[in-house]
């Protein structure tokens, strides 16, 4: 399995594929695990854990769709709201140190767009860095995952309607690269580079579109 994009989504996809028996090549145009938007995120992650006050995925979805003002994909939003609590717990098991209340429960705070104290964080504005570090640790210890840095994807290779790999090039040498794969997972982020000002890295350019 080829996973294109070595940010949080790509690292988790690579880990999941390896856990299901696949041999994985995880590639990124930067250093795998050091690029993307997640590592730069400082503040909070929304998850209906209900640690501070009653909450649940259904209310989280209502808030998400209302804040999205018609721009959200409802199916994807529902999937996000339903799965976020288990992912927060999983990251906790992977040593992400969420901020705590005095009673030991995970601290949750209000954030714009939410009707509940729902958002979790790591102290000292290190939420994204802590998540990325935990994921890097998981993939670095998995022998089924090979990492390939400084390679950017340019196209998918197809045969009779099936995707059989991808093409790209090594950024440092401009050498063309062709990768054969039985499956390709695109985790290439958005296209915030189209804006003059953005809080995301300036190389998130929408290559996966």
Residue ranges and their predicted role:
Residues 183-209:
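Glycine-rich loop(s) and the adjacent beta-strand/alpha-helix scaffold that form part
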Residues 12, 16, 36-37, 184:
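Hydrophobic/aromatic ligand-binding patch that stacks against planar heteroaromatic rings
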Residues 6-7, 124, 174, 194-202:
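Alpha-helix N-cap/helix-initiation motif
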Residues 29-172, 187, 193:
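Conserved N-terminal/central alpha/beta ligand/cofactor-binding core
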Residues 19-22, 33, 46-48, 199-206:
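A glycine- and small-aliphatic-rich helix-loop capping segment at beta-alpha/alpha-beta transitions
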């Amino acid at each position: 399995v080829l996973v294109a994009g070595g940010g949080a989504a790509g690292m988790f996809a690579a880990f999941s594929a390896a856990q299901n028996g696949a041999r994985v090549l995880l590639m990124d145009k930067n250093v795998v695990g050091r690029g993307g938007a997640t590592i730069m995120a400082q503040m909070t992650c929304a998850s209906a854990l209900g640690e501070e006050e009653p909450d649940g995925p259904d209310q989280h979805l209502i808030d998400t769709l209302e804040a999205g003002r018609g721009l959200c994909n409802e199916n994807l939003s529902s999937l996000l709201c339903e799965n976020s609590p288990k992912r927060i717990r999983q990251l906790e098991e992977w040593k992400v140190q969420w901020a705590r209340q005095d009673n030991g429960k995970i601290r949750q705070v209000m954030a714009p767009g939410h009707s509940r104290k729902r958002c979790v964080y790591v102290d000292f504005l290190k939420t994204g860095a802590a998540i990325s570090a935990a994921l890097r640790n998981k993939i670095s210890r998995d022998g089924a995952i090979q990492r390939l840095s400084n390679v950017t994807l340019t196209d998918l290779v197809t045969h009779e309607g099936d995707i059989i790999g991808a093409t790209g090039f090594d950024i440092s040498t401009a050498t063309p690269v062709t990768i054969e794969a039985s499956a390709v997972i695109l985790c290439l982020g958005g296209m915030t580079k189209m804006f003059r000002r953005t809080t995301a890295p300036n190389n998130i350019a929408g290559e996966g579109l």
